[in-house]
Design a protein with these regions (language model features):
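Extended alpha-helical targeting/anchoring segments
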Residues: 1-495
Length: 495
């Protein structure tokens, strides 16, 4: 069944929408997201998958996949570039905030939110880096060494989406019809759906190279250097510059092959609220993030601060003891409260007056290797602002920077002296109807050329023990480094 009908699509066109999502449903019980992703990679290497598991045991309603982006928006050191589906530069500019450029692209793609359709029916998929902050805070100098060379922003525009409905075992093929000539646009959408169906049923799977680590992981800071950095941060806390700062450490290794199998293992061993794989022009990313940066749905904003960490116990009894220890740790509770307040302040920048509130306060969130204290903050988006404004207000999250945020970012720039890039930024989507869902870019492996990186951080407060914070970075990175190491053996186990 095709929805909407042509006559219904014409009505949406009359309402001023530039695009209308057209959907076709089919059974998905003999198709898996991973097998389909392999077919999409055979068609076009620039593709993505977005998945979700709630409470480590319940799959989210939808899994989204896309391939062959129509446009690619990138920003590097203030230079904004728009490329078409063939990689040809069609526009390049500088001297403006990236959000202006992004809005300019999206203004021709406004679409309706149709009842009963998946939450994402087309839009931008990709990332905003941690360093995106510099475009909003003009006085902030982020001049750390850039050893990785990743974009500040990389957003691919997809007007075709494949959605798994994990509740109804349905596959939903979505193509967006342009309304400039709605009859012609509708027929093209039907043709796009036909081609997607053919690819799903009869397409060949890509021969994807397995990951092979050629070296062991090398840290940016060894234990001694990281501990010195913590002591310097504590000095700034004693001097009154900041209350808290998040200091990260990076692991780097040489590798051959793809992160595809690493993603397969991550989704199995570390099921998380945000699981994603995407392959762009200059970056390949596999991740399983526990934490929302900001979510905008029909004008309602949410952010979910996670702060306070313990490793998981080997037994249920040990796990509960570690939970009690965490909830009784004054240092961890103080850190969490600071970051809840920062989340409220961030949402307050873009929310209607009086609408910001803490919905859920201090509950334990468990993941494969660690547990965290989590809270939920919500607000109502101001009518004169949009989802991109929300990213601008919240990024980077306080849980990846510190408090006060701007001074903490200055200290991170000084002490780490290494551009964070995608780590600590935002990964997710902005859809054509104005909604947004982004997670914090943590628990990720990301690759450029023959180098793969894993980064993690620890929140530093006045009574932090440097060696403990170094160990916390290791604990947080372990789910990803284990997945990278063990994914080298998947093919042999499946033979």
């Amino acid at each position: 069944m095709i929805r909407p009908t042509l006559s219904e699509a014409k009505e949406y066109a009359k309402q001023g929408y530039h695009m209308v999502p057209v959907c076709y449903e089919m059974l998905s019980d003999i198709i898996t997201p991973i097998n389909l992703l392999k077919k999409l990679k055979a068609e076009n290497e620039h593709c993505y998958i977005l998945e979700s598991v709630e409470n480590q045991e319940l799959w989210g309603r939808y899994t989204f996949l896309g391939y062959s982006p129509k446009l690619d928006i990138t920003c590097m050191n203030g230079t904004l570039t728009l490329k078409d589906e063939n990689g040809t530069v069609i526009k390049e500019t500088s001297g403006i905030h990236p959000e202006i450029f992004i809005r300019e692209v999206l203004k021709d793609y406004k679409s309706p939110k149709i009842e009963g359709f998946p939450t994402f029916t087309g839009g931008l998929v990709g990332y905003f880096s941690y360093d995106y902050l510099k475009y909003s805070e003009k006085k902030l100098v982020l001049d750390a060494k850039d050893e990785e060379g990743f974009q500040d922003v990389d957003l691919m525009l997809f007007d075709k989406v494949i959605a798994f409905d994990n509740v109804r075992s349905k596959l939903i093929l979505i193509a967006n019809a342009g309304t400039a000539n709605i009859e012609e646009g509708y027929q093209k959408a039907l043709q796009d759906i036909k081609e997607m169906k053919e690819l799903i049923l009869h397409g060949a799977e890509a021969d994807i190279a397995a990951p092979v680590l050629k070296t062991e992981f090398k840290p940016l800071f060894d234990k001694e250097a990281y501990c010195r950095m913590v002591e310097k941060a504590k000095h700034y806390i004693y001097e009154g510059d900041i209350f808290q700062v998040v200091l990260s450490n990076r692991l780097e290794a040489e590798m051959e092959g793809s992160l595809f199998d690493t993603y397969r293992l991550l989704r199995s061993t570390n099921p998380s609220p945000y699981m994603f794989y995407f392959d762009g022009d200059t970056i390949e990313v596999a991740g399983a993030s526990p934490e929302t940066l900001v979510k905008v749905e029909d004008g309602v904003l949410h952010t979910f601060p996670l702060a306070g960490t313990r490793p998981r116990g080997k037994t249920k009894v040990e796990d509960l003891e570690l939970e009690k220890s965490l909830m009784a740790d004054e240092k961890e509770l103080a850190e969490h409260n600071m970051l809840v307040d920062l989340g409220r302040n961030d949402l307050g920048k873009v929310s209607q007056f009086g609408t910001v509130e803490v919905e859920r306060y201090m509950s334990i969130q468990r993941y494969s290797h660690v547990m965290h204290i989590g809270s939920t903050v919500r607000g109502t988006l101001r009518e004169d602002l949009d989802a991109i404004s929300a990213v601008d207000a919240v990024l980077p999250a306080g849980t990846l920077s510190g408090a006060p945020k701007i001074r903490a970012c200055e200290i991170i720039n000084e002490l780490e002296n290494n551009k964070r890039g995608i780590y600590g930024g935002a990964i997710g989507y902005i859809d054509f109807s104005g909604n947004l869902d982004t997670c914090i870019a943590i628990r990720i492996a990301y690759r450029k050329g023959n180098k793969v990186f894993v980064r993690s951080g620890a929140g530093i407060v006045a009574d932090s023990v440097p060696a403990n914070e170094f160990q916390e970075c290791i604990n947080k990175a372990k789910a990803v480094t284990d997945a990278l190491i063990n994914s080298q053996k998947i093919r042999g186990d499946e033979a």
